[in-house]
Amino acid sequence: MRCTLLKHGAQASDIYTVQVPGSFELPAGARLLAGKQKLDAVICLGCVIKGETSHNEYINHAVATGLTNLSIASGQPFIFGVLTPDNEAQALDRAGGKHGNKGVEAATTAIRMAALKKELTDKTKIGF
């Protein structure tokens, strides 16, 4: 992810990395970070592997809803980069393995959404 941001013009000093205890805390951590720094986007990465119960579904739904609500309320892109695999092998396949890299995808989404926000903010025309 970091390499993707740097490749597209981000400065290393402008990339902030913070960690939260678990995926469930991603929305709260993202909100705390966004409240302290002027950021173009907030990329939230995590992994919730399915267990023997449906607990993962509640976590995934809460995180997705939390990040969506933050994006809508703030007008700032909060990017959902959470893997939701059934097992560790699937997680590794999606974290740079044979099924791509969710971190790179999240970084690309952040770049595109930040560009869209800038484009729409800079426009003086009214659109409907």
Task: Label each PLM-derived region with a short phrase.
Residues 2-21:
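Glycine-rich phosphate/diphosphate-binding loop of Rossmann-like nucleotide-binding domains
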Residues 20, 46-48, 83-87:
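Short, ordered loop/turn segments at secondary-structure junctions
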Residues 25-67, 71:
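Glycine-rich phosphate-binding loop
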Residues 74-90:
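Mobile beta-alpha loop/short-helix "lid" or hinge segments that flank ligand
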Residues 86-100:
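Phosphate-binding/catalytic loops
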Residues 100-128:
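A charged, well-structured terminal subsegment
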